Amino acid sequence: LPQANCGGCGFPGCSAFADACVKSTSLDGKFCPVGGQSVMDKVGQILGIDASVTEPKVAVVRCNGTCDNSPRVNLYDGAISCKIANATSGGETLCSYGCLGCGDCVEACQFDAIHMNPDTGLPEVDEDKCTACGACVKACPRVIIELRPKGKNNRRIFVSCVNKDKG
């Protein structure tokens, strides 16, 4: 295992994931997103268990509230944290669903796979570096980041907005 201890597998770390694999009679439902299919194949080979094939995933930011699309109407002057901004002021735009732009997702990513775009104010995922560990998903208080299958030829279909209001 890669020893990333990211928790992307659903266990508190690589050691706990390894223990769960050793104690199982099947690797179904178990996957190390950092190591990918090749690591799971090796784990299966060592344990004498077939590793189920899991489609690779990547983090997707479901917000198009760029500086142009969702202009700032407030000035948030507090700790630079999406979690805090969401709980206290609701952010600087009128959109109560979109990205707050403080970069909690960037801080959570230990693989340097997500960065804030200074022009749009939104996070952008580097698909080549993203391991789909889910740390950015957990860090986002607005739940605008999802793990999606990479898709054929790295193509995905998704709506770049999580607003559920009518109209």
Please name every model-derived segment.
Residues 1-122, 127-129, 135-167:
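Ferredoxin-type iron-sulfur electron-transfer modules and their immediate structural context
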